[in-house]
């Protein structure tokens, strides 16, 4: 995944001066890339990483922040492992390090989510948590229908903590479990760009946005080329008409719109080219296309009734005169 590699290389070079921010990133990397192991009755802290650059960053932070010596070994690609990995291990002082980073609680028990001090830290520390999680277990796919920024988590509690951290950065993320693997996913294009910036991938986000815009232009061009298809033309006309009527309904009803009807109307206006079925998938929680259609019908009917009662132009007043030429 070239994009993932680009992001990780850029993030591995982010310079951080604040000790608390460096510590937040390091603790999250350790939590998401390995964790604690018992070796010869001693607690060892291990971290399996993608690149030698990241391994050097982790070893440098371990030495400078906690004064511990770490070993590194190379795990060659084989079988299910498609690429070479780098294992950083701390044996001497492993338990002390685990306590200092919050991987062990006060009762010497491994934490299940993220250390509390990380999830309640400053905005800069929260961004470092996400940077560490992505460096340890993140992927970024190309812009398009299936675009996603995704982090594989060590468990459900860690996933939920990461979702909460994203919320602190004003980014909407969702946790999901597939075949026992917990992941946190960001799918909205704007949210992906916002998270990349927050983590510090300023260069990569520019490239990602350019790719996204090119894909949108191509998709729009393809739709225009296919407009000769009568079904597509009718769908386009119906979408234009629906949006025009919903906009007029919002004007007529003003603040009197019931929240559930307003939500359906906002969905229609936000995703103007989407079918009713697609609108249902965009809803949170998801709705059936019949539920979406029903709410929009009730919204229009309520607006038209108020328009008649008050002698106002109805929802048809906003329909374009050249609708047949769409």
Curated annotation (Swiss-Prot):
- Gene symbol here is whiA
What Gene Ontology biological process does one annotation of this record name? regulation of sporulation
Q: What does this protein do?
A: Involved in cell division and chromosome segregation.
The protein here is known as: Probable cell division protein WhiA
Annotated Gene Ontology MF terms? DNA binding
Instruction: Return the annotated DNA-binding positions.
Output: 275-308
InterPro entries associated with the record? Homing_endonucl (IPR027434), Sporu_reg_WhiA_N_dom (IPR018478), Sporulation_regulator_WhiA (IPR003802), Sporulation_regulator_WhiA_C (IPR023054), WhiA_LAGLIDADG_dom (IPR039518)
UniProt lists the family membership as follows: Belongs to the WhiA family.
Report the Pfam families cross-referenced here.
HTH_WhiA, LAGLIDADG_WhiA, WhiA_N
Asked if the keyword Cell cycle belongs to this entry, the reply reads: yes
The answer, when asked if DNA-binding is one of the entry's keywords, is yes
Q: Which UniProt keywords apply?
A: Cell cycle, Cell division, DNA-binding
Q: Which NCBIfam families match?
A: DNA_bind_WhiA
